[in-house]
Amino acid sequence: MNKLSNVYLTIIVALVLLTSTKAFTNEFDWQSAKLHNYKANAKFSENEQLTITLNSSKGAAVTLRPRNDKTWDLSAYHGLKVSIKNISNARIMPLITLDAPNSEKWQEIDNSLYLEPQQSKTLLVYFYITAKDFAQRYPQYQKMNGGPNTQMIKWDGIDISNINKLSFSAINVRDYISAQGSYIVQHIEPFRYDQIFDNKKEIPFPFIDKYGQYLHGKYPGKLNSEHDFIEREQQELDDLKAHPGPDNRSKWGGWLSGPKQKATGNFYTKQIDGKWWFVDPDGHLFWSHGVTGVGYHGANTLIAGREHYFQDLPSKHSKYQDFYSKGRGTRFDFTKANLYRKFGKNWQETTNKRNHQRLKSWGLNTFANWSDPSGFALQQTPFTIAVHYKSRMLEEKMPDPWDKDFGPNITEELKNKQRHEHGDSPWNLGFFINNELHWMGPSSYATIISNAPADQPAKIYFVDALQKKYKTIAELNDTWQTKFSSFNDILSSRKKLKFSQFKEDATWFYQQMANKYYKTCRQAVKSVFPNHLYLGSRLHGDVNAMVLRAAEK
């Protein structure tokens, strides 16, 4: 594949709509849509094709909008079905996006797919709506993320009755996905689930069977009787025997024939020939390849108020009584009930053993984050431990590292992991603290810290640092172009300052925040588990250099 530089992507969009979609054509009139180019050139041809040329710059796109400031109502459908052919000599990744005018910037519907040269595929662009819209449209399906023949709920869903933009673009990954090439969108039509799946248009109640499955449909893998458990158990045992797992692996899943390192009895990291590796407790190089959430917790669903959804629920006084639970309403755990049906009274022990067998057979070697600690006790597969704790927050997804309880609460939670989740085990690869923190950037936290209350520990630290840097408030005001009467005035102010006003100081604070966070977390881990790894925080969104510099320390 050629290197990408100043290249162009040509997309030929054939707007071929079947006569069966006449209603959709009226709502979604492509020929009369307004064409907008962004770092691109596009035009309609006489044969109803739309030829688009995108340059390789990030963000290049062509959009279609309804004329006369109208919008398209697609609420009768569940998605778009798009037939695409790659007619270029390179791998490409078309991206189709829908937007609504009343949505936030981060709310949109999109989907994409890989296409090898000359390959044809059909892309399904599923429609997602917000929880509020779902509750209004489908009151018969309570507390669900989607029902039979409904759109699905997603946190960034949009109002599909009010679509004002359809965009065509491409995803560019250097040396893997080319931005140079052509593809044809051969056919576009809206669809409903009952048109493409084995779904009835009108769904009667109940719609969930005794095994927790969708009742009104046939599909591969569906359980039809108790005998299916016996049959599938034998099938899996035969498969595990035929595929015991990869050869040339240590008992930890490390690389037996690789360059041997020092055996320390615990996992550690080492840079070898310029590349960082895990090293297993016996000194073999280790590449962690795992899956999160290994265990037997799954389909624990609310029953109270929704009894009519379910067919043949067992009695609360039957042998399935342990799979009922209370709290915020009565619930039933179909996953555990089915494991009981399959493995009998020792289902927990058998399930844990089987999970280790499965991962090894599939070529995996790690019980990753949020896996069930009961599986760790068997000491057969390396695992990671997720650490969550209470703390005062600086932002919704960012703890305040200057909070007096920040470090102590992490330490206490680590001690709980030591007591209850086999934290001291040599099979413990390490600890993740927090999940997907929103680091954003200095400009975002400039607004957050300037608007924080006077008792926010991070703001107190920042103002103290400012007082040490600037001899007088007049000197600070001169630099920031502000009119604070004192440093205490900064502390009590809830005014959101512009990043440009105090860019240097805000950037310094951001770096200090990252340093403080990662240093405190690592110190907490090492204070309880001196021989185990701190694996970091897991990052959300774009990663900037300042956060990476702090994390790598």
Which residues are covered by each model-predicted region?
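Active-site-adjacent substrate/metal-binding segments within catalytic domains
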Residues: Y214-A377, M393-D424, K495, F499, ...
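Extracellular beta-strand elements of beta-rich domains used
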Residues: L166, Q186-P190
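Extracellular glycan-recognition surfaces and repeat-rich motifs
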Residues: E27-I52
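Short beta-strand-plus-loop segments that form exposed binding edges in beta-rich domains
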Residues: F168-I177
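Extracellular ligand-binding interfaces
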Residues: N55-K154, N162, A179-I184
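Bacterial N-terminal signal peptides that target proteins for export
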Residues: M1-T10
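Polysaccharide-binding and catalytic clefts of secreted carbohydrate-active enzymes
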Residues: P281, V291-T292, A299, G305-K345, ...
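Bacterial N-terminal signal peptides
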Residues: T10-T19
